[in-house]
Amino acid sequence: MKIYVVATIAWILLQFSAWTTTDAVTSITLDLVNPTAGQYSSFVDKIRNNVKDPNLKYGGTDIAVIGPPSKEKFLRINFQSSRGTVSLGLKRDNLYVVAYLAMDNTNVNRAYYFRSEITSAESTALFPEATTANQKALEYTEDYQSIEKNAQITQGDQSRKELGLGIDLLSTSMEAVNKKARVVKDEARFLLIAIQMTAEAARFRYIQNLVIKNFPNKFNSENKVIQFEVNWKKISTAIYGDAKNGVFNKDYDFGFGKVRQVKDLQMGLLMYLGKPKSSNEANSTVRHYGPLKPTLLIT
């Protein structure tokens, strides 16, 4: 009888463990107090490795591919400083940024979210520190153009490219929303920088490597960075449907010159587009999709 009871309890604990693992939100943290280039690189690799399917490979390459949708919908990213923590919420199946959490100037945790990407109930599960009363749907939309407009950097030809990237800039922009009264301009600038330093860096090793090369200093993004960001789906689709053994069947131009070798793109993570194509399918005409929405439903 004792053996039976112990076995029953063990089974119940195992089931409970499985439930909590399924329902829990995975968190990945970057400590911004004297970070090193190696720590940042490891942080980006953790994001990439956490959402990839190790059994998926496209186009005969070793590039990581996001896994298919699962019960665990979101990934939590924490930025820690000596003054506290600011967090982002990412969708696991595409790394779109859906929400962020920060303390206000009265030390109350408040969550802000894009209503088309996440519900209030999901926001509560992602950021339990913020009660429903302390949640707010953002007034602007989740595309780069809308965020840039609210960041007030769109005069003339200016865009997020002029805002720049870099670990020091990420720290500065984080502190502008950490334990402060909400200022939309500061919030939008933080989102632009954080999006590119997390989701975009995980997708594109090219961006990750630029941050490491300039570490920890701020640097202006180049046009190639922007072209990568708006062409993630197009690049993923081309590799998925028109590459064999890491070579495209024709030259592709994604906005920064012709490319034939997939490795020259320095990709980090591909969009999930289904099971890998067979060799015959890969040599056929590549399928065409609608406009890409890279990080935040971006066109």
Curated annotation (Swiss-Prot):
Positions annotated as glycosylated: 283
Listed GO MF terms: rRNA N-glycosylase activity; toxin activity
Pfam families named among the record's database cross-references: RIP (PF00161)
PROSITE patterns: SHIGA_RICIN
Keyword Signal carried by entry: yes
Reported tissue expression: Seeds and leaves of the plant.
Catalytic residues (positions): 200
Entry-linked SUPFAM superfamilies: Ribosome inactivating proteins (RIP)
InterPro entries linked to this entry: Ribosome-inact_prot_sf, Ribosome_inactivat_1/2, Ribosome_inactivat_prot, Ribosome_inactivat_prot_CS, Ribosome_inactivat_prot_sub1, Ribosome_inactivat_prot_sub2
Signal peptide (UniProt feature, chain positions): 1-24
GO biological process: defense response; negative regulation of translation
Enzyme Commission (EC) number: 3.2.2.22
Cleaved propeptide residues: 278-299
Catalytic function, reaction form: Endohydrolysis of the N-glycosidic bond at one specific adenosine on the 28S rRNA
Coiled-coil zones: none
Keyword vocabulary terms for this entry: Glycoprotein, Hydrolase, Plant defense, Protein synthesis inhibitor, Signal, Toxin
Function: Ribosome-inactivating protein of type 1, inhibits protein synthesis in animal cells. Useful as immunotoxin for pharmacological applications.
Similarity comment text for this entry: Belongs to the ribosome-inactivating protein family. Type 1 RIP subfamily.
Protein name from the UniProt record: Ribosome-inactivating protein saporin-6
Species whose genome carries this gene: Saponaria officinalis
Gene for this chain: SAP6
